[in-house]
Structures are given as C-alpha cells and as structure tokens.
C-alpha cells in the first residue's frame, strides 16, 4: 500500500507541475448560445496578423520588389502551383479559397508556438492556437466539404451524384461513407497534431530547463507548416476530384 500511495503522490506531483489544461473552455453567453470565446479571440488575432501583413507588404508595390512584396509574391505563386497541380486547368477560381485555408492554418499553427498567449489570463482555460480547438478544425473541414460539393455540382449539375453508384451500385454505402470520412480525417489530423505539439512543449518547459525544449519547438514549427500544406493540398485534391469525369 505504501508503494502504491507513493506512486500516486508522485504522479499527482508531476501532473500539478506540468499545469497542462485540456478541454478547459472560456465561454461567452450570446442569447441562448454558448460561444468559445478563446477561439474567437485567437482567430481574430490571426486574421488581424494576416490582413495587417498583406496591407503593409502590398500597399505600395515597387517595380523592384521589397522583401515583403517578394515574400507575398512567392507565397501566391506557391499557392497557385499547389492549386493547379491538384485541380487542373480550372484552378483559377479556387486559388483564393485554397490560399485562405493555407495561410489561416499556417499562421494559426505558428501562433501557438510563437505568440505568448498565456500572458492573457482567462477565468477558465487558456488561449492557444485556433487550430488547437476541434471546433476550428471541424469548421475548416466542413468548409472544404461544401467547396468540393459545390465544385462538382456546378460542373456536372445533379449528374454529380451519379458518382455514388459508380462503378457499381453495390458500392453506394462505401461511396457515401467516403464523404463523411474526408472531413473527419482532415479535422482530426490537424487538431491532433497541433494539440500534441503544444502539450509536449508545455510539459517539457514545465519539467526541464527552458533551453531543452527549444529543439522540440523548432520541430513543432516545421510540423505546423507541413500540416497547413497537407490540409490545403488535400482540399485542392478533393475539389479537383469532384470536377473530374471519374472519381
């Protein structure tokens, strides 16, 4: 019993030391609805960063581009290449959507590692990257689903739904299930990676000297960028598939 009691106390001490909170939310009461205040706060901060950066970089275009202008032109070219590769020749109208997804997710992911969210104290929970909340990633995934349904229907009309019985009607349940698994995989992949990255960094910072977690933080930044690329690339691929003659 003494060994068990000692083990329990040790585990409790480690938990208290880490100070990690998962599932704690700060809500705003708006009418009859509860709104995740922390997600709205961090999302608007990310949006403000994106709008501010874009305004500063392109408000006075130069014949010889500045560093900021060069950076934004490179990002735009990169997003266009991703869209064209995945969607095909009709990629043009979808560049803003794919670009918005990529930039919002990229900056959101990096904000979790670079911005000192914990300085702002909330009555419940704590501020973190918007993509650290499952509601944000599900919303992004549902937007992607709506986009590829719209792309398919606008290209093929109601004939788009004939894909569910191709190549044989026996596959109808599987083809329907696929449309549910796409947003689920998108949302949970992004949410799980960002949440795990932030938890690892928080625990390491709490348990070991501050210089030790730095390599993990750099790895987290790299992973965050990759996750933004994966999400936007898959979104473009799904849109491209919905516009093809076969799926």
Curated annotation (Swiss-Prot):
NCBIfam families given for it?
ATP_synt_6_or_A
* Job of this protein: Key component of the proton channel; it plays a direct role in the translocation of protons across the membrane.
Cross-referenced InterPro entries: ATP_syn_F0_a_bact/chloroplast, ATP_synth_F0_asu, ATP_synth_F0_asu_AS, F0_ATP_A_sf
GO cellular component terms given for this protein = plastid membrane; proton-transporting ATP synthase complex
Q: Which gene encodes it?
A: atpI
Q: Per its UniProt record, what Pfam families does this chain match? A: ATP-synt_A
SUPFAM superfamilies to which the protein is assigned, alphabetical: F1F0 ATP synthase subunit A
Q: What is this protein called?
A: ATP synthase subunit a, plastid
Which UniProt keywords are listed? ATP synthesis, CF(0), Hydrogen ion transport, Ion transport, Membrane, Plastid, Transmembrane, Transmembrane helix, Transport
């Amino acid at each position: 019993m003494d060994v068990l009691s000692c083990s329990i106390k040790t585990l409790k001490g480690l938990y208290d030391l880490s100070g990690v909170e998962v599932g704690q939310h700060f809500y705003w009461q708006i009418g009859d609805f509860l709104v995740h205040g922390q997600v709205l706060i961090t999302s608007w901060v990310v949006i403000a960063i994106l709008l501010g950066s874009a305004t500063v970089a392109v408000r006075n275009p130069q014949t010889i581009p500045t560093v900021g202008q060069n950076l934004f032109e490179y990002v735009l070219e990169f997003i266009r290449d991703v869209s064209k590769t995945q969607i095909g020749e009709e990629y043009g109208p979808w560049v803003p959507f794919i670009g918005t997804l990529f930039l919002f997710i990229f900056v959101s992911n990096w904000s979790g590692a670079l911005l000192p969210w914990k300085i702002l104290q909330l009555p419940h929970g704590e501020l973190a990257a918007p993509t650290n909340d499952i509601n944000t990633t599900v919303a992004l995934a549902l937007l992607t689903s709506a986009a590829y349904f719209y792309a398919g229907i606008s290209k093929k009309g109601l004939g788009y739904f004939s894909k569910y019985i191709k190549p044989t009607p026996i596959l109808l349940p599987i083809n329907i299930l696929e449309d549910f698994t796409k947003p689920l995989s998108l949302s949970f992949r992004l949410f799980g990676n960002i949440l795990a990255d932030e938890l690892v960094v928080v625990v390491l910072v709490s348990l070991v000297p501050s210089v030790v977690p730095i390599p993990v933080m750099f790895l987290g930044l790299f992973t965050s960028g990759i996750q933004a690329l994966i999400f936007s690339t898959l979104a473009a691929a799904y849109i491209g598939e919905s516009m093809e003659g076969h799926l």
